[in-house]
Amino acid sequence: MTNQSRRSFLQGSIVGAAALASASVVQAAPRSKVPAKWDETVDVIVVGSGFAGLAAAIEARKAGAKVVVLEKMPTPGGNSIINGGILTATGCPQQLKHGIKASVDLLAQDILVAGAYLNDPAKVRVLAEHALSNYEWTVKELGVEYNLDAIGQEGGHSVPRYVFTKNGSGSGIVRKELDKCKELGVEVRLRAYVEHIIRDDKGRVVGLEVREGYRFPKKDSGKVKFIAARKGVVLCYGGFSADVKFRQMHDPKLTDKFSTTNQPGATGELWRETYNIGCAQIQNDWIQCGPWSNPKEKGMGIGWTFTQSAAAEYGLWVNTKGQRFVNELANRKVRADAIFAEEAKGLKAVAIANQYGADKLEAARPGIMKKLVEPNIVSKYDTLEALAKDFNIPLDELKKTLAQVNESAKTKNDKPFGRYINNEFKPLTEGPWYAAITSPKVHHCMGGMATNVATAVLDVETDQPIPGLFAAGECVGGIHGAVMDCLVNGRQAGLSAAKYKL
C-alpha cells in the first residue's frame, strides 16, 4: 500500500468511525442548577453509610454540625457491613502480645509497596501515623470488640498486623458506628439516592438533588428533593465493583464472567456524576480482585477466611499440578494475577492447610471451621492421598512441594518465593487436611477522586480544592488503603466539612 493510499485509508477510517460515533451519541447529563428554593437545609450532608461515611458523620456532629447521612440502599452499611472485620493497627495490643516488632515507618513502606508507589506518600504517612489511635477510637469511643488473642498477616504486609472483630464481620464496627450516630442525633436516611451534586456559579458545592423513597436500581423512582449544605458535602459512596459496564470501561477483562465480593449497590452513578461536575479522578483502572475468593459462594462469603488466614499464613497454595506458583502472602494484585496465569493454562489454584492451620483460623474466628466444612465450602480429608485424588493433583508432586514448604518452616526462609514465615508457622506433617479452590473476584476500586491531605476534593481544571466538597473511603484514589483508610480519612472529612468556613 502506498503512503498516499494508506493516508486515504486512515482518513476514511477516522471519518467513518466519527460518523458511527455521532449516530449513537447520547447527551451527557446536564449539571443540576441551584434551585430557586431548597426543600431542606443542614450543615453537612454525608453520602454513604459505610465505615467512612458513618465516621465522617460522627466527627461532623461532634464538631457541632447538623448532619444527615444519605444511603441509596434499603439497609445501611454498604460493603462495610459485610466486610471481613479486619483492620490494620501497628502497635496494637495483639501485636505486642505476640512479640511482633512493628513501626509506623514499616507500615507506611508496606502500603507504598503494595500500591506500586502510585500512592500519595503524604496521605500514606497520615494513614500510618493515625492507624493506632483510630483503632483505639473504635474501642474506647464506639465500643467495638476485637479478638485480643489473634493477629493476622495480610498479603503485601511484611509482618502480621491485622486484628479481627469478635463477630468476624465489618458489622462489628458498622453497628457500633450506627449506634453512635443515633446517640448523637444523626439521621441515617435510607433509600435516598443522590442524583446530582450541585455547584453554584462560584464553583462551590452547595447541596444535592436527591430522590427519596428510591427503589434500587430504578433511577427514576422516588421523589425529587433538594437538600442544601451550609458547610459541606462529604462523599463516601464507595466503589463500583458490582457495575459490570462501568468497571469494564476501565478494565475490559472484568466482564460479567467475573463475580464480585460486593453488595449489589456498589455501582458507578456517583463516579459518573463526580466526573460531570469536574472532580479530578486518578487510577480508576486499578480495580483489585480478591485472590482468596471461593467460587462456591456468592459475594464475599466466608471461604476467603480459610484461604487467607489458614492456607496463606500456615499452609500453601498450589496449582493442580501440585506446584506452588506464588508467594501466598504477596499483595493482592500479585496473587490474583498469578492465579489468572494458572487459569489461562487450564489449571486451578488450590489452598491447603492441615489441622494446625485450621486451629489458627478457629482461634481467630471461633466457630468458623464448622461453617466452612459442613456446607463443603472447604473440604476436609483424613489423608493427603484423598485430597490429591479429589482435586486431581499428582500426589508425588504435592508431597515434593510440601517437603519444600516444611524446610522453609524449619529455616524460616522461603527461598522459592520469599513468603514471610512467622514464628508460629509449623511444618505440615500430619492431617487431617483441608482444601478449597481459590479464584479471584472483583473486590475493590483503588482509584477515585483526587483529594488533598485534609480530604478536600480537587478540581480537574484548577487542581485546587472544590469549595465545600470532601471525600473519603473507596471513592478516593491515591491511597491504596482499606478499612483503616476509611476510618482515618472518614473522620478527617467529617471534621473538615464541619469546620469549613464560607
Task: Please give the residue ranges for each predicted region.
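N-terminal secretory signal peptides and thylakoid transit peptides that target proteins
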Residues: 1-17
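A conserved FAD-binding loop/helix module that cradles the flavin
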Residues: 255-262, 269, 476-500
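Short beta-strand "acidic-cap" motif of Rossmann-like dinucleotide-binding folds
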Residues: 66-71
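Beta1/beta-strand and adjacent pyrophosphate-binding region of the FAD-binding site
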Residues: 38-50
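An anion/pyrophosphate-binding glycine-rich loop and adjacent beta-alpha core
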Residues: 271-273, 280-393
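Conserved N-terminal/central alpha/beta ligand/cofactor-binding core
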Residues: 12-14, 72-187, 191-193, 204, ...
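Glycine-rich loop(s) and the adjacent beta-strand/alpha-helix scaffold that form part
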Residues: 215-297, 492
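A glycine-rich dinucleotide-binding beta-alpha-beta segment and adjacent secondary-structure elements
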Residues: 397-477
